[in-house]
Amino acid sequence: MQTINVADTIIENMAYIPGSNLDEKLTNLMVSNFSLQLRECEEAIFRFEAKYGMGFAEFTNSFDTGEVDRYAHEIERDFMEWEGFCDERGRMLSSIREMRRRICC
């Protein structure tokens, strides 16, 4: 366990955060933050799905088989961004699960 210095105003405002102790409160803050990041990823993923009319796995297949012009700058950029959002979504889900396990058990 590590010790950290926290400003008094932060400690005072922790009263508004759900949790029975500081560890639970910090964990809840992290889950809340990860959930916001997850929502942003899912919104970005949805925009790509709406733009291309398919999910990322299907788009990847179309990209790999040449059904879409993989050398077009916009498509290549979209592929990389979409892939990044999918990876980030997975990391956020994993982090949320881990944090919730800490609260529950």
Give a label for each model feature:
Residues 75-105:
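Short, compact, well-ordered microdomains
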